[in-house]
Design a protein with these regions (language model features):
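C-terminal non-catalytic scaffold/interaction domains in large multidomain proteins
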Residues: 1-170
Length: 170
C-alpha cells in the first residue's frame, strides 16, 4: 500500500484595501457684522480696522478668492461695488497682511502666510448651512484634492467620469 499524501491548500497573499481618508471638510465662513459707513471706509484711521477684519476673514476662510475677500470687506462698510478708491485702500491693506497669493486663470487666491498651497490636501464643498461656492471661488488646490480622492475611490475612470465624479464632490 502506497503512501497517501495530503495536499495543502494554496496560500494566497491578501491585500487589505484601506479606505482613503476623506479630504472633505466644511467651508468655514467669517461672521461679519456691519462695521461702519461707506464714508468711514476711506478714512486713514480705518485702515487698521480693515486690516484686522481682513485677517479675521482669512483666518476663517483662507484660501479665499481676492474677489470674495474684497466683497466681504467692503460689504462690512455698506459698499456694494468696488472701484478705484476701494481698490487703493485695499491694496494698502493687503500689502500689510502676512499672506500667500496663488493665481488660477485670472483669479487670485489669498492664503494665510502659514498655509502652503503645495501641500494643501483638503477640499471644502459647502459651509454649515450647505451653501456652495461658485467654481471660480474654489482654488485649483482644492479641486486637485477632490480629484485625488475620486481616483483613490474609483480607479480606472474615463476623463469624463472623473470630471463628473469630482464635480459631485462640490
Amino acid at each position: 500500500v502506497g503512501e497517501v499524501k495530503t495536499k495543502q491548500a494554496p496560500v494566497f497573499e491578501t491585500v487589505e484595501k484601506t479606505p482613503a481618508p476623506n479630504k472633505a471638510t466644511l467651508y468655514e465662513t467669517a461672521d461679519i457684522a456691519p462695521v461702519g459707513t461707506p464714508e468711514q471706509f476711506y478714512l486713514p484711521e480705518t485702515v487698521p480696522v480693515i486690516q484686522s477684519l481682513a485677517v479675521l476673514i482669512l483666518s476663517a476662510e483662507a484660501p479665499i478668492s481676492r474677489n470674495a475677500l474684497v466683497h466681504k470687506l467692503i460689504g462690512a462698510w455698506g459698499i456694494t461695488r468696488s472701484g478705484d478708491r476701494t481698490d487703493k485702500v485695499l491694496a494698502d491693506v493687503f500689502r500689510m497682511i502676512d499672506k500667500r497669493i496663488t493665481i488660477d486663470e485670472n483669479n487670485a487666491f489669498f492664503w494665510l502666510g502659514k498655509q502652503n498651497p503645495d501641500t494643501y490636501d483638503i477640499y471644502r464643498p459647502a459651509d454649515i448651512q450647505g451653501n456652495k461656492r461658485e467654481l471660480t471661488e474654489i482654488p485649483s488646490e482644492e479641486i486637485i484634492s477632490a480629484v485625488t480622492e475620486v481616483l483613490s475611490e474609483q480607479i480606472g475612470l474615463s476623463r469624463a467620469d472623473l470630471i463628473r465624479e469630482t464635480a459631485k464632490k462640490f
